């Protein structure tokens, strides 16, 4: 800091006259200045500079200037008298170091400036804050993430600057990017992001960058199922006594707030954390009932690990599972309860100063908290102050109140430089704690003044509020006869500046502590005033300062006060003060009603400052429990504002909080001579300015007087750098919020997400919204931004949507015709009185009530107590196909007796008709899809026809003609032209330039002349002046005629003499077979012509639609669709182009690439609407997300990502070209493209070819002996379409071109030829014409269509592709579609429309009804080709009439196609099959007609391509009724009614059922298949067990890469299925609802790329299965064998296993022989056998086809023998085993375990507590054990045959919980003890 005084210096007499003892400290009489400014300026912020002028008789003009890199960037000035401020607006984009310069002028103008000075400041580029808000914290796949961004300045005003935003997935891949975002209103920006159906699960991040700073917010993507209720665990906040029991509570409530009734299971233990994380406690299991809530005991002594150290820290882990009365389950987990012996933590409060001032009392405060962060009451602490370890100056013991202890050290010696504070817990609630607690320390440094004059501000006693007047007490050790100057800084800027004279309000004297002997060294003090001698009495005067609290001071302000003594010494102090949060923009959001019923309309009322932009959201109340911090709160806003605070980093301890000396005992610490002072410096008045965040420039005031100033110098403390957070702000709690520790599983949806402007003068706005049908509570919130009032956040408002009486039921999504379903209906009564309910269930004709034949509705009576829910069950049978609606209506009547008055319920219909007024009514409708039996099949008849066709030709700016063939007898045509100039038309005898061609030029010579010449570029034979005849802005129409040798050219659509422009007569008529179009060099053009059909310009065709003879009756469906655009079907089915799954990296591209082609087509033809653009870009964004999940670390892609051994060359090229094409429409990270391109080039061979690195899933692309040729062509196409920017990339494509040019003549198969021709054409290779000639020679042309067929492929009988031999079939090898599409791409690239049209017609015939083709690759390539053709031929208009009629005379339909509906897919159902159809069309343009036929067949494959074996294993019935004799079945239903239909308990018993499915398959041709998909449908009412599916992925030898669960189907993906061995999958299925008479289901396997290669096999339950006897239907009860025939050709599936085991017994299973080697430790298997290693266990599981899993060693120590009534089973079935007789009130000392009943419980209820202890002594056999070990484990040594023992299970196990299984062993071993043994962590799945 430098300065220059230009006025005369004051005489030294002024200093000499000042009193030595400091009694007079008046304002200095000499003129001078002091300028204070923020040490950190911020870009875009108006910074305030405070100016103080001493003793000036008049105003001084002060100018301030900010200089960066030597150039002034901003300046300002103002007139100052005594004190004032100047404001500087810092430009945006500025950052780094800058100079702040100031000048003062005005006293003596003739002498120049009065003063000037300068100092360095830091300019921080962050001058605004960004707040990111999402609608939810957790999303499911396919959800849309809704994002709002609020940008504000430090004063909370909107900032309208450009933003950049992007989203990262958990792997760091950039999923989407928004550039140059601009707030749409008041600093608010809205965005949204669609998630794909298979995103990377985990934590995602939204990043927003503004002014060079990045802000982020995270959200999670998880898969979850919406439960019906919410489960919460409320444990104690902490464990007070480790030897006593605490109480916890489990709460289960429906989302609408009502309690859940059901069964509760609790499992808990104590686990160590941090250093003690290796300590694992013992589990305790409890079961009981629950109604809304249930208390339970937490006894830590039973769970805590044995012999834990004194300072152990852990947490109680609690799992709770509730099963409601309707069978719904929910699991919750909590580990938020700390367990530790030291219950109190000590912290010095944030306002406890780190320095003391001699002569003034030191006031401090200690905060005491319990482990959960709550205030600790009644804690006795001892506070000591020491100068040295042996020099104690203060000791006090205080008891805490509300967690606080205040203390005051009356006086500290004036010569003391340091004080050491020690705080220690002495007693809790009066009980001494001894040496159990470690003390906490704080080091205090001295403040120094040479005159011993000190100021001390006293903070207010309470947080300040905006609008009030703040009172600050100021103490001074010198007389209060001075002018007090003050500065208030907040958010890094000066917000208040002023002065006031000091008035003494209190005067007192106090005795100072003795001075230290060490003399005090003075620095920076005038020699005229030596230090005063120590005095016994110190006078202290007290004055006050009153300030108005403004919103700019929220939430944290810094107050600086100072005065100047006559000798120029500045005396100062500063403090920080808190202001309660306050928004100037007061925002509120309220509903018009607090409670409403679902479906009603409510008003959402918003109030904010007028002109505000308000964003409103309404989400389910449970969202707030998902993850803390997801919504924008005032706390987040004001915490961000605190970050603008700039304070001295030397002002606080490096440790944020107390510390102790690690490794030293308390005794050693007390005697230690080492005193660790963290700072060896004192503070002075200059530090007060620095602590406030200010820099000072002055010529009059001396501020720096520190002692021992080695560290604290001008050089050491420049303008301080900004911090990420305020070091003296409220420190974050060391205990995170409890909600963060809780894992929630209920994720509701968003209702409202909307922004609006408040324009009404009243500041109110209203949204009328319809309440969703959900019964729940909705929380409304609002955030507003205003230019005048700034940001505001509303308090949340609650709307409860609730019906006190309602009914609910669920149906399976899909049922097969003939099946019976047991449907639970639940009635909920929350009306406060008992209700007599009449439930009426109505069904349509195709659904029957089992046991009530012929009825369309059934009424049942029930009584429901208040606050409860009651279920009933109804059995339905389904016979009609399609979507069926079921309606339930419930009427409730008040009944105080709850049906105990004897009213009859035998005929509920009669009581239902009584005259009473119902107190509750509800009705619900649900839909269920009923499908036919068998396997669905489909084919599509397609026709693309053009009665007359408009052709669109685009010509580049080069002189090359594009030729179109002339229809016969056509001697005139009209053409619409758009061009700048030089449009040329050629009349030629061939499709190329010929010697005798006629050339017509329009707008030549820069659009001034037109002419006719008799050769290309020939001399004009006729010409005319035609200025501006052409235009690029519009199409202009011309006609051309050559009849009889007279060539005429005219303007307009119709020829006339007046319209002739130029004419010429030839000697003889020209031979015109082709018409060419071009533009000259330097001009581009577009031409539109009509190609006329022959004869009457109409189209007609007749064809037959049929189904196979064996089709399932009633399953036939046919739909006709017409659209006037070749891309139309694709436009209408962009998200579902194939009837195939999309589970790998290549198939996923079907969701991506077609959208690019469609967008390009619509954009090029100017048809892209905002709606279509939004939809297609959403698909692209989702496809991009999905594809990145298949990326490998080296930048390549493979079918299953990192699960594959290497990347795939073919797939990486496919992804590269697709991503490159998408760049025009969505964000594609250039790094992803560069990585893929680099990987590809690295694989190139020396000859320029690309080898097939990785697996090629579609073997057609290998092309036999020329396999490298098509792959090289494919890769070079990808590189060219991506673009070659570098020399390396261009060199790579050149090498590939040379390879293809040399290889093209040798490639004779059409696939290689088509790909090579397209690649050479793209490369503009001279070899391209010859390649095209060869390709044309291989074409198959018939019936006006052109295509290419496979050669050198498998010798496959046509029957392989045809499902039946009755000509009802459709199958073309997908490679043929692909190669034909490449030929079309070549034609469109050359502009050969005439050759392209027959190819388009053939491709259109191969399309499926969804707009795709047969597989992924052919669909993507064909759609790209069709899109390019559509761009080339687009004419803009259509006018067609299409008639369709059936020969059955039951169908006739006329479709009109015109410009307004040409992209609308018009459909009509064809009523009956088989039938003949006749189609006719007339008009202009082309259209695509498709007939989609679907049907079901019993066995679709005559010659299967795979062997397929299916096996269904069911557990034996346990506790079920014995099978009925046939006589009973033939009797009346009353003999054995389904009494459990209305019995919830019975249904629960039936529902706990699981089966094991095993499917094996192998390829029946040589070698192996392409990538294959195995589809396994599940029995109705069952769902797949995900855990068993996940186990399949662990077997690397199986070849299974992925599985998907799609509804009732499980799909398994294999990269190939070999022929040498059986590929098998085995998994479990769990029953969800009871279904009887289950239908046989088809398991199918097929080659993904050639779906005609397939096999299908049916399976069903066995005749004797309990599943076959669940439900009855009259006389045919349980007789599944008598199921009626389902129509011609139908054969029911085999009962029992679908195949005999010996059918595949001779063929080995793939992957059973593992290369295990000799490594690995012994592993206990779930079958009780010890295996040499985990590898050997997997090998045994494969060979035995058994679900063996690793188990704890204790599982191999005992044979778990079930009760005699049960058969042996695997461990995973133990959940259903009834406990043995040894249950309660038994203590077995030898076992170290106890089971006891926790009475009292209601009769019939038992809550069991099981406690684990050390294992008993075992001393024989091969058991490794120790009597001194406390571990409950015991394991076998590695022996050939482990010894087995018998026992009985006495403890139940529930799947999915970490719960023990208990085995009672009466005679464990000879010499052993009787005992109850526990498998400690045996989680049997």
Swiss-Prot record:
Residues 1-25 form the signal peptide. Residues 1514-1548, 1793-1852 are annotated as: Disordered. One of its GO terms (cellular component) is plasma membrane. Glycans are attached at residues 117, 190, 267, 757, 1439. The gene is CPAMD8. InterPro entries: A-macroglobulin_rcpt-bd, A-macroglobulin_rcpt-bd_sf, A2M/Complement_sys, A2M_N_BRD, A2M_TED, Alpha-macroglob_thiol-ester_cl, Alpha-macroglobulin_TED, Ig-like_fold. Residues 1794-1806 have a biased composition (Acidic residues). SMART domains: A2M, A2M_N_2, A2M_recep, KAZAL, Thiol-ester_cl. It is linked to Anterior segment dysgenesis 8: A form of anterior segment dysgenesis, a group of defects affecting anterior structures of the eye including cornea, iris, lens, trabecular meshwork, and Schlemm canal. Anterior segment dysgeneses result from abnormal migration or differentiation of the neural crest derived mesenchymal cells that give rise to components of the anterior chamber during eye development. Residues 1706-1757 form the Kazal-like domain. The keyword Membrane applies. The record marks 671-672 as: Cleavage. Interacts with heparin. Keywords: Cell membrane, Disease variant, Disulfide bond, Glycoprotein, Membrane, Protease inhibitor, Secreted, Serine protease inhibitor, Signal. One of its GO terms (molecular function) is serine-type endopeptidase inhibitor activity. Proteolytically cleaved into 2 chains of about 70 and 130 kDa. The fragments are not connected by disulfide bonds. Disulfide bonds join 1712-1742, 1716-1735, 1724-1755. It is a peripheral membrane protein. Pfam families: A2M (PF00207), A2M_BRD (PF07703), A2M_recep (PF07677), Kazal_2 (PF07648), Methyltransf_FA (PF12248), MG2 (PF01835), MG3 (PF17791), MG4 (PF17789). Belongs to the protease inhibitor I39 (alpha-2-macroglobulin) family. It is found in: Secreted; Cell membrane. Residues 1819-1831 have a biased composition (Polar residues). CDD domains: A2M_2 (cd02897), KAZAL_FS (cd00104). This is C3 and PZP-like alpha-2-macroglobulin domain-containing protein 8. Its main location: secreted. GO terms for biological process: eye development. The keyword 4Fe-4S does not apply.
């Amino acid at each position: 800091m430098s300065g220059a005084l230009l006025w005369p210096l004051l005489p030294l007499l002024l200093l000499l006259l000042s009193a030595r003892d400091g009694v007079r400290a008046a304002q200095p009489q000499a003129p001078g200045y002091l300028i204070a400014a923020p040490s950190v300026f911020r870009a875009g912020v108006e910074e305030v500079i405070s100016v103080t002028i001493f003793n000036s008789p008049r105003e001084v003009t002060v100018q301030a200037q900010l200089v960066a890199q030597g150039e002034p960037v901003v300046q300002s000035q103002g007139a100052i008298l005594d004190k004032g401020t100047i404001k500087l607006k810092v430009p945006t984009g500025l950052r780094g170091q800058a100079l702040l310069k100031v000048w003062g002028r005005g006293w003596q103008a003739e002498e120049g400036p009065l003063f000037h000075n300068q100092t360095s400041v830091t300019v921080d580029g962050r001058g605004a804050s960004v707040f990111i808000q999402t609608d939810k914290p957790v999303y499911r796949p396919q959800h849309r993430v809704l994002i709002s961004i609020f940008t504000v300045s430090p004063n909370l005003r909107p900032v309208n600057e450009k933003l950049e935003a992007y989203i990262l997935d958990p792997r760091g891949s950039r999923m989407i990017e928004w550039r140059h975002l601009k707030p749409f209103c008041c600093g608010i920006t809205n965005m949204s992001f669609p998630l794909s159906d298979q995103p990377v699960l985990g934590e995602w991040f939204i990043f927003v960058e503004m002014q060079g700073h990045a802000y982020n917010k995270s959200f999670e993507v998880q898969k979850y199922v919406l439960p019906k209720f919410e489960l919460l665990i409320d444990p104690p906040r902490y464990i007070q006594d480790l030897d006593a029991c605490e109480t916890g509570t489990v709460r289960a409530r429906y989302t609408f707030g009502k309690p859940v009734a059901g069964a509760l299971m609790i499992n808990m233990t104590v686990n160590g954390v941090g250093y003690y994380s290796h300590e694992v406690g013992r589990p305790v299991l409890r079961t009981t009932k629950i109604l809304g809530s249930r208390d339970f005991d937490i006894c830590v002594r039973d769970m805590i690990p044995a012999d834990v150290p004194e300072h152990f820290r852990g947490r109680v882990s609690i799992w709770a599972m509730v099963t409601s009365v309707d069978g719904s389950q929910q699991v919750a987990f909590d580990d938020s309860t700390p367990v530790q012996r030291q219950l109190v933590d000590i912290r010095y409060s944030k306002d406890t100063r780190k320095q003391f001032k001699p002569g003034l009392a030191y006031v401090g405060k200690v905060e005491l908290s319990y482990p959960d962060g709550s205030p600790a009451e009644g804690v006795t602490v001892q506070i000591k102050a020491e100068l040295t370890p042996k020099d104690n100056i203060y000791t006090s013991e205080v008891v805490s109140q509300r967690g606080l202890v205040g203390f005051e050290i009356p006086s500290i010696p004036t010569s003391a430089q340091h004080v050491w504070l020690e705080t220690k817990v002495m007693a809790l609630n009066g009980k001494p704690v001894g040496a159990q607690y470690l003390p906490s320390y704080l080091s205090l440094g001295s403040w120094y003044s040479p005159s011993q004059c000190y100021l001390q501000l006293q903070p207010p006693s309470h947080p300040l509020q905006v609008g009030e007047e703040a009172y600050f007490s100021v103490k001074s050790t010198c007389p209060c006869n001075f002018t007090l100057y003050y500065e208030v800084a907040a958010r890094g800027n000066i917000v208040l500046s002023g002065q006031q004279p000091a008035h003494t309000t209190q005067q007192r004297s106090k005795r100072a502590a003795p001075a230290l002997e060490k003399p005090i060294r003075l620095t920076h003090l005038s020699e005229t005033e030596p230090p005063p001698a120590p005095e016994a009495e110190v006078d202290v005067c007290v004055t006050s300062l009153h300030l108005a609290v403004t919103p700019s001071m929220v939430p944290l302000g810094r107050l600086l006060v100072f005065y100047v003594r006559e000798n120029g010494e500045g005396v100062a102090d500063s403090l920080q003060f808190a202001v309660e949060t306050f928004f100037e923009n007061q925002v509120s959001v309220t509903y018009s009603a607090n409670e409403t019923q679902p479906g009603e309309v409510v008003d959402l009322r918003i109030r904010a400052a007028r002109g505000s932009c308000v964003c409103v959201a309404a989400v389910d109340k449970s969202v707030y429990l998902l993850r803390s911090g997801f919504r924008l709160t005032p706390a987040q806003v004001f915490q961000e504002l605190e970050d603008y605070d700039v304070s001295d980093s030397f002002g606080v301890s490096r440790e944020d909080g107390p510390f102790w000396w690690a490794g030293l005992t308390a005794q050693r610490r007390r005697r230690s001579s080492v005193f660790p002072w963290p700072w060896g410096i004192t503070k002075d008045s200059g530090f007060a300015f620095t602590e406030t965040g200010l820099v000072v420039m002055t010529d009059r005031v001396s501020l720096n007087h520190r002692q021992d100033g080695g560290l604290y110098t001008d050089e050491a403390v420049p303008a301080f750098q900004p911090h990420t957070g305020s070091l003296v702000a409220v420190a974050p709690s060391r205990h995170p919020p409890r909600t963060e520790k809780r894992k929630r599983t209920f994720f509701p949806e968003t209702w409202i997400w909307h922004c609006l402007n408040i324009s009404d003068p009243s500041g109110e706005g209203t949204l009328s919204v319809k309440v969703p049908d959900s019964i729940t509570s909705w929380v409304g919130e609002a955030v507003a931004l205003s230019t005048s009032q700034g940001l505001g956040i509303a308090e949340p408002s609650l709307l409860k949507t609730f019906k006190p009486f309602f009914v609910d039921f669920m149906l399976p999504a899909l049922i097969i015709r003939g099946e019976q379903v047991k449907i639970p209906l639940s009635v909920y009564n929350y009306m406060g009185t008992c209700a007599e309910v009449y439930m009426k269930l109505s069904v349509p004709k195709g659904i029957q009530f089992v046991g009530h034949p012929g009825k369309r509705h059934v009424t049942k009576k029930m009584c429901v107590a208040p606050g409860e829910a009651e279920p009933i069950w109804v059995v339905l049978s389904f016979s009609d196909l399609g979507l069926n609606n079921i309606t339930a209506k419930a009427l409730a009547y008040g009944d105080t007796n709850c049906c105990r008055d004897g009213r009859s319920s035998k005929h509920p219909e009669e009581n239902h008709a009584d005259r009473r007024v119902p107190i509750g009514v509800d009705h619900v409708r649900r839909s269920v899809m009923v499908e036919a039996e068998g396997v669905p099949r489909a084919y599509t008849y397609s026709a693309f026809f053009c009665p007359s066709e408009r052709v669109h030709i685009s010509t580049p700016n080069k002189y090359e003609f594009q030729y179109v063939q002339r229809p016969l007898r056509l001697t005139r045509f009209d053409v619409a032209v758009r061009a700048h100039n030089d449009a040329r038309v050629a009349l030629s005898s061939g499709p190329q330039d010929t010697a005798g061609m006629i050339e017509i030029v329009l707008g030549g010579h820069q659009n001034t002349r037109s002419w006719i010449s008799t050769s290309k570029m020939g001399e004009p034979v006729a010409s005319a002046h035609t200025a501006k005849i052409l235009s690029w802005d519009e199409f202009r129409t011309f006609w051309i005629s050559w009849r009889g040798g007279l060539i005429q050219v005219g303007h307009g659509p119709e020829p006339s003499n007046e319209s002739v422009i130029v004419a010429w007569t030839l000697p003889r008529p020209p031979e015109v077979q082709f018409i060419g179009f071009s533009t000259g060099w330097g001009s581009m053009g577009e031409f539109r012509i009509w190609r006329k059909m022959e004869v009457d310009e109409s189209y007609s065709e007749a064809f037959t639609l049929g189904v196979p003879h064996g089709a399932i009756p009633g399953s036939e469906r046919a739909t006709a669709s017409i659209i006037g655009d070749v891309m139309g079907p694709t436009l209408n089915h962009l998200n579902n182009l194939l009837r195939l799954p999309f589970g790998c990296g290549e198939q996923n591209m079907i969701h991506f690439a077609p959208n690019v082609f469609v967008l390009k087509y619509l954009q090029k033809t100017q048809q892209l609407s905002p709606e279509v653009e939004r939809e297609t870009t959403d698909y692209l964004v989702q496809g991009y997300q999905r594809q990145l999940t298949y990326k490998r670390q080296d930048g390549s892609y493979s079918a299953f990502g990192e699960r594959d051994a290497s990347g795939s060359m073919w797939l990486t090229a496919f992804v590269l070209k697709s991503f490159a094409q998408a760049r025009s429409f969505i964000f594609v990270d250039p790094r992803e493209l560069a990585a893929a391109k680099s990987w590809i080039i690295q694989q190139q061979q020396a000859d320029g070819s690309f080898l097939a690195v990785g697996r090629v899933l579609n073997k057609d692309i290998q092309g036999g002996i020329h396999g490298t040729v098509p792959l090289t062509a494919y890769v070079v196409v990808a590189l060219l379409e991506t673009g070659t920017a570098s020399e390396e990339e261009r060199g790579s494509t050149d090498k590939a071109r040379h390879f293809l040019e040399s290889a093209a003549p040798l490639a004779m198969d059409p696939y290689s030829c088509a790909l090579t021709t397209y690649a050479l054409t793209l490369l503009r290779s001279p070899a391209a014409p010859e390649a095209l000639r060869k390709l044309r020679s291989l074409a198959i042309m018939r019936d006006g269509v052109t295509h290419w067929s496979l050669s050198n492929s498998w010798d496959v009988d046509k029957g392989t592709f045809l499902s039946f031999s009755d000509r009802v079939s459709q199958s073309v090898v997908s490679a043929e579609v692909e190669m034909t599409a490449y030929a079309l791409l070549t034609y469109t690239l050359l502009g050969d429309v005439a050759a392209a049209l027959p190819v388009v017609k053939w491709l259109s015939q191969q399309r499926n009804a969804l707009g795709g083709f047969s597989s992924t690759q052919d669909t993507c390539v064909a759609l790209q080709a069709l899109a390019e053709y559509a761009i080339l031929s687009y004419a803009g208009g259509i006018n067609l009439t299409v008639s369709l009629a059936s020969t059955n005379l039951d169908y006739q339909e006329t479709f009109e196609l015109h410009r307004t509906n040409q992209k609308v897919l018009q459909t009509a159902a064809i009523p009956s099959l088989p039938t003949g159809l006749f189609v006719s069309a007339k008009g202009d343009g082309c259209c695509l007609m498709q007939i989609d036929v679907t049907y079901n067949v019993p066995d679709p494959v005559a010659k299967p391509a795979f062997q397929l074996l299916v096996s269904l294993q069911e557990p034996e019935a346990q506790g079920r009724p014995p099978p009925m004799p046939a006589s009973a079945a033939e009797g009346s239903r009353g003999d054995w009614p389904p009494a459990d239909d209305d019995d919830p308990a019975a249904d629960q018993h039936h529902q706990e059922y699981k089966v094991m499915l095993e499917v094996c398959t192998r390829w029946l041709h040589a070698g192996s298949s392409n990538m294959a998909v195995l589809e396994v449908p599940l029995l109705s009412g069952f769902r797949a067990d995900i855990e068993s599916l996940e186990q399949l992925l662990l077997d690397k030898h199986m070849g299974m890469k992925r599985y998907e669960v799609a509804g009732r189907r499980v799909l398994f993906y294999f990269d190939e299925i070999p022929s040498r061995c059986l590929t098998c999958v085995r998994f479990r299925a769990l029953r969800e609802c009871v279904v009887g008479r289950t239908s046989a289901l088809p398991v199918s396997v097929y080659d993904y790329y050639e779906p005609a290669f397939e096999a299908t096999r049916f399976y069903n339950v066995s005749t004797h299965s309990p599943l076959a006897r669940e439900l009855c239907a009259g006389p045919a009860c349980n007789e599944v064998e008598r199921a009626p025939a389902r129509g011609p050709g139908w054969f029911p599936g085999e009962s029992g296993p679908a195949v005999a085991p010996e059918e595949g017994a001779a063929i080995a299973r793939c992957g059973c022989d593992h290369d295990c080697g000799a490594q690995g430790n012994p592993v206990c298997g779930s079958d009780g056998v010890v295996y040499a290693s985990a590898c050997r266990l997997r090998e045994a599981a494969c060979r035995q086809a058994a679900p063996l899993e690793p188990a704890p060693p204790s599982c191999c120590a005992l044979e778990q023998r079930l009760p005699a009534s049960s058969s042996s089973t695997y461990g995973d079935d133990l959940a259903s085993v009834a406990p043995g007789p040894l249950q309660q009130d038994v203590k077995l000392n030898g076992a170290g375990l106890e089971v006891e009943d926790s009475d009292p419980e209601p009769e019939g209820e038992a809550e069991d507590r099981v406690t684990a202890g050390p294992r008993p002594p075992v001393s024989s056999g091969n058991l490794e054990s120790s009597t001194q070990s406390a571990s409950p484990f015991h394991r076998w040594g590695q022996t050939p045959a482990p010894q087995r023992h018998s026992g009985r299970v006495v403890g139940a196990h529930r799947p999915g919980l970490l719960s023990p299984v208990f085995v009672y062993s009466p005679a464990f071993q000879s010499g052993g003890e009787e005992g109850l043994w526990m498998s400690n962590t045996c989680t049997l799945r």
